[in-house]
Amino acid sequence: MDDRAFTKLTDYLKQIPAIEGSIGHGADDEGRWWVKFTINIEHPLAWQTVQELGHVLNYLSVNERLPTSFQPVSPPPYMNGGPDEFLSWVIESHDPEFRPGTCAKWLEGRLPNPVSDLEQWGME
């Protein structure tokens, strides 16, 4: 899969306040893709970010599920360190027809809008 296929999704994820650092991506030979990034666990919106992404990507509704999964990934903590340094998050697509740009559109339609505006996240 061409790197340009990921631009809309990675650009969108970079706007989410709790997501920091670089965003990796790739795809297998069958076209199933993944995007990997870090959520700053000290950010006040860290767990709300996890909740929002988990809701849309893992279980939007009983009748409307996306062919994606959102989950944490980590190397062995005993060999590396704690979650502030080595915990990452990955979005994986299980259907080659579901493209990264389509995923971005689903997130845009369901996460706070504009996603970069802290007030839209309902911070108190």
Report each predicted region and the residues it spans.
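Structured alpha/beta or helical-core interaction and ligand-binding surfaces enriched in interleaved
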Residues: 1-124
